[in-house]
Amino acid sequence: MTSFWSWYVTLLSLGTIAALVWLLLATRKGQRPDSTEETVGHSYDGIEEYDNPLPRWWFMLFVGTVIFALGYLVLYPGLGNWKGILPGYEGGWTQVKEWQREMDKANEQYGPLYAKYAAMPVEEVAKDPQALKMGGRLFASNCSVCHGSDAKGAYGFPNLTDDDWLWGGEPETIKTTILHGRQAVMPGWKDVIGEEGIRNVAGYVRSLSGRDTPEGISVDIEQGQKIFAANCVVCHGPEAKGVTAMGAPNLTDNVWLYGSSFAQIQQTLRYGRNGRMPAQEAILGNDKVHLLAAYVYSLSQQPEQ
């Protein structure tokens, strides 16, 4: 901030503290040194106030807060451009420096443990109980907001506990997904195949997983199959089982990221979808991602209950 505003904040802060000290001392003058049964002379609804001095503990508490405030403003940045003199923080304390200090301490304490697991194959790490506990905590802190605390996903966010993987479920593939993220784009087709085509393809796609067309809706499954063969097989494959290299889902199973109702599939066909998994390398680093990949991999290796 500019020098003017720095001095403004400084003088205002110190002036306020000085005013409070003056008020405290001024009101203390003239008070009785000892307690008395006399009142100040006024009564409200039968309630009278004794003419006694401020309790000493109350007065000392007030003084203590003033001393604390002055000490705080000396140690921490609170007076304009004053950076404070808190030991251990070159150039003054800041939230960023405090965070970095805590991170450095944590890395010093846990870094060797992360490095130990990073040197092991993901499959082997996935069998280590301590590693899974650490990976679970990383997941809860960084991934559960999208995939859920139980990792079973939600609308638009995949379930990580089954064996259905858009980009592949091999350990190193999972690690790559977490490290670098994924960008999946499903184009909209309403301007290409029209509303009738959307309806027919939706009916055909639902039929691939054994779903019937809702009553009252007329579709041409054969025509939908032709449109699918002409436009959709390049991503989803000729058998509609998906292509992991492109993140295109299998349309013949019962796993639906954006819903399997007739209306939801039409919505997907009409306007497309744009799914994005953010990269975590810059946030977590390779060693933590390695541990997290092992945890995610372990979720789909557990026997069904």
Swiss-Prot record:
The protein's matches in NCBIfam families, at most eight in alphabetical order, are given as: ccoP
Give the record's pathway: Energy metabolism; oxidative phosphorylation
Q: Does the UniProt entry include the keyword Translocase?
A: no
The record's section on InterPro entries has: CcoP_N, CcoP_N_sf, Cyt_c-like_dom, Cyt_c-like_dom_sf, Cyt_C_IC, Cyt_c_oxidase_cbb3_su3, Cytochrome_c_Oxidase_Subunit
A Pfam family reported for this protein in Swiss-Prot or TrEMBL: Cytochrome_CBB3
Which prosthetic group or cofactor does it need? heme c
Task: State the name under which the record lists this protein.
Answer: Cbb3-type cytochrome c oxidase subunit CcoP2
Which positions bind heme c 2?
A: 186, 232, 235-236
Q: Which residues form the Cytochrome c domain?
A: 130-209, 219-300
Instruction: List, alphabetically, the Gene3D superfamilies matched.
Output: 6.10.280.130, Cytochrome c-like domain (1.10.760.10)
Name one cellular component (GO) term: plasma membrane
